[in-house]
Amino acid sequence: KDALPFTVIPEFIHNGTLIVDDIEDNSDLRRGKPVLHKLFGVDIAVNAGNAIYFLPYVAIRDSKLPAEAKSKAYDIISSQMLKCHLGQAIDIYWHSGQAERIPTEEEYLQMCANKSGSLACIAAKLGAHIGGGTESQIEALGNFGETVGVVFQIQDDILNISENQSI
């Protein structure tokens, strides 16, 4: 029950990244419906996506966590969000046609770990931290979350180039 206010944090972050990603990809639809920037304009969508990134900090600030636990939660979110945006930047660079070569498998997997692995890592690490896990448990669950995110990103990339959307 005490952890309930924190369960929305990964969803806030994920939805913010989806808004921004839709703009960067110039998508028309998300989950079968028009994307935010097509409905309200890029300026409103960028502002909304960015604003959503800060909602987790408000949830933590307003929580009953001790100051040290709040600081650790802020660090988990900040460090992983930086990785997320680095991964997205690399993905944009590769898709822009500016890259001089095809990325290696290792480079691709690192991009996946940064871009999507970091989001799942936030959920796993934050849950372990708020649940009272040890540092080794927090790291182990973070690594597990990152791996889940990598697998998700690989599947998403396959779906983006596949005609068979049921893969």
Predicted regions and their residues:
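Mg2+-dependent prenyl diphosphate-binding active-site environment of isoprenoid biosynthetic enzymes
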Residues: 1-167
